[in-house]
Amino acid sequence: MRSPIHHVSPGSAAASAAAFAFTLVALAALPAAAAPIHTSYLWHMHQPIYWPDRSTWYGVPYETAYETITLDHSQSDVFTVFNSDDRVHDYQDYPKTALGMLGDLPDAGAQVSFAGSLIQNVTSLGNAGWNGGRYAANWYQPYRDAMGWTTSGGRRRLDPVIVGFHHPINPLVDDAVFRRMIQAQKAIMPGTWGSPTLSNGFFPAEMCFSERMIPALAAEGIQWAIVPDIHIARACADYPYNANQDNCDPPNPADQSNPAQGYFYAQSISRGVTTKVPVPYGLRPHRARYVDPGTGVATSIVVVPAANGMSWNEGYGSYGTGELDAIASRNDPAKPMLVLFAHDGDNAWQGGYSYYNENVTQFSHAAAAKGYEPTTIEEYLADHPVASDDVVHVEDGGWVNADGDFGSPQFINWNWPLVNGSGQFDIPNGWAEDERNWAVLTAATNRVLTAEQIAGAPVMSRVVDPTQSGTTAVERAWHHLLAGHESGTM
């Protein structure tokens, strides 16, 4: 029998309101440990290296934004990218402005993933005083200020979570490349944010996740990662797949090891897809585990589901509490839901003045007024630790945002199969730009790893900046190889 799906509609508003009112009454009778729905944000900031060839000015490294703009090297309009009024503020002060309006909410905050390539680009513009000083030499100071603000539990209100330095599609890259991406990001963050304490969290580019990443994440000291809620949902035994709604492959039955949930909250979003998530199960943190098939050794981390449907709606227009109200009656106060709005922080409406200066504070205060709890992921996990036996399976895949992919477990937006001249799949004889790119990267990775085995491991600060004295050929090779894995070129 198909699982019941709840669609938001005007006709259900009265029922939802009644259910919500009942929930509030019930919550009032619960002991003090009972908790409401929590909310938080992840703002993702990224721009690539637009001209990853060797620098004309400096010879050894790739070009960063100031040189690329000055020499007009890229086919992209890099000047306009960085001269956008909103991006000038996104990369300097909008997050601080938004969080500065939430100081009366004791635990309210956000996470930001600021890719290393973007740090290098903005630093190049700030140091050069580009375009009349659009970016300050200390452009990072407002971020540092906000990272110094703390919740009631003493945790950062703005948590700079780790992200792959060059925004790779992590499940598709070699494990060694994946770890070097994380290590490069860890190398550039302290000098940028002025704090020796690295975040415990990880945001995967395009939210592309696979449990195969878990051993590398754990080895790099990462305790939790953000994942798409839909890939916990699709791994449930009774996921209500519908090709016209999902717009991607059906789940593999071998992936559907999560218990049947019986109820899925459905949202049809303007991206052209319907997300269906079991609540509360699909909107609260769990653990995910990878078992090495060769050794049987299990490694686990906490996975924090991002609310894909709600994130899309929250990022593209004024957003109230209606979608929280619709699911509030299903919250488990002992294991409360964490509704995480995770999306780009520098594109579309979600990167603009109204979003940061109006919507964040309006929503957060409206949510608090209704009894919901704005928080940060670190604060939530401290207040509501995930049990060691609370383990879910997370299906491979990314967020629903990528056009033509919609969370495909094959990552087809970056991994389109080989086709012939008629567009039919032809693996032995066909062509696909992405697949040929991966072939080149695989060969290059093999050469760099072989060189590393001969010459020794790199110093990551010199991989990030190979103009430093003592930089080796292996470090220069890693510098350029990592840039070649940028998702925007795939």
What do these predicted regions represent?
Residues M1-A15:
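N-terminal secretory signal peptides that target proteins for export/translocation
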Residues S16-A29:
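Bacterial N-terminal signal peptides
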Residues L30-A34:
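Sec/Tat signal peptide C-region and signal peptidase I cleavage site
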Residues A35-D175:
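N-terminal catalytic cores of secreted or lumenal carbohydrate-active enzymes
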Residues P36-Y94, S117, A243-P278, G282-G309, ...:
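Active-site and substrate-binding clefts of carbohydrate-active enzymes
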Residues S113-L118, G164, N200-S210, I230, ...:
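Short, solvent-exposed turn/loop segments enriched in Gly/Ser/Thr/Pro and often Arg
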Residues W130-G153, L158-D159, S195, A218-H286:
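Acidic, His- and aromatic-enriched active-site or binding-groove loops in soluble protein domains
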Residues F178-E206, P293-T295, A326-A342:
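CE4/NodB-like, metal-dependent polysaccharide N-deacetylase domain
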